[in-house]
């Protein structure tokens, strides 16, 4: 059985992630490298465990989380599909077809806002990925340059990110602290509305509700 540890040691996967980080850094994008994918993998596995998925499903969620952005080095556009195809090429002879298809599906759907959530693996990955907004994802250190891009501004403004799961209330909550001196809360919604809609859909698929709290104010 292939595990997350096996995936993390695979030279092809590591190179794809490194190249993707370099490609997006060239355009001053937020971090999509190892810090991001390791956090998403960890968050996905923890979420899967808390909502009661099997140990194998937990591992599939973690694997999908680690590999979800590795198609960016080919092209940012449709990177989710490139990532799924790359995963197939590397592991088609190493992972059972059912598990392989679930991971590929999750990778392919994670950044497609029009796609329907079709499995718990996909739902968990969406929630783990779209909830990762934080200052440390901003690669650029020059504040003047940061101010020129709304994605960098919003991520830089987030000083605290807490992802909470309450199985009893069946509620998943993203709690953020935002420096409103750097960016108004409304700018968060300018770029993250679609992502929050995705999170709500994903949570609903899991029979959970998704909540958003910013600066101790409940918005969802």
Task: Identify what each model region corresponds to.
Residues 26, 49-165:
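Divalent metal-dependent catalytic cores for phosphoryl transfer on phosphate-bearing substrates
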Residues 1-78:
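Acidic/His-rich, divalent-metal-binding segments that scaffold phosphate/diphosphate chemistry
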Residues 44, 124, 199:
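Aromatic/hydrophobic pocket-lining residues that form π-stacking "cages" and hydrophobic walls in ligand
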Residues 9-12, 16, 99, 120, ...:
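Alpha-helical structural motif
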Residues 15-22, 89, 105, 109, ...:
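Charged/polar, solvent-exposed surface patches and flexible loops
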Residues 132-220:
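Terminal helices and disordered tails flanking the catalytic cores of nucleotide-processing hydrolases
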């Amino acid at each position: 059985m292939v595990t997350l540890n096996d995936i993390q040691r695979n030279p092809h996967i590591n190179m794809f992630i490194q190249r993707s980080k370099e490609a997006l850094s060239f355009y001053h994008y937020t971090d999509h490298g190892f810090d991001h994918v390791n956090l998403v993998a960890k968050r996905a596995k923890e979420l899967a465990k808390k909502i009661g998925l099997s140990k194998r499903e937990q591992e599939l969620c973690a694997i999908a989380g680690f590999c979800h952005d590795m198609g960016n080095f080919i092209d940012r556009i449709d990177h989710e599909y490139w990532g799924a195809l790359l995963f197939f090429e590397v592991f088609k002879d190493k992972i059972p077809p059912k598990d392989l298809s679930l991971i590929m599906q999750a990778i392919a759907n994670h950044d497609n806002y029009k796609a329907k959530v079709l499995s718990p693996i996909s739902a968990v990955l969406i929630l783990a990925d779209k909830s990762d907004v934080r200052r440390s994802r901003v690669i650029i250190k020059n504040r003047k340059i940061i101010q020129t891009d709304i994605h960098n501004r919003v991520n830089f403004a987030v000083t605290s990110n807490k992802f909470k799961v309450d199985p009893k209330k069946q509620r998943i909550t993203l709690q953020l602290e935002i420096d409103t001196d750097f960016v108004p809360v409304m700018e968060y919604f300018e770029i993250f509305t679609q992502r929050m809609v995705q999170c709500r859909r994903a949570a609903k698929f899991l029979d959970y509700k998704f909540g958003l709290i910013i600066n101790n104010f409940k918005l969802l």
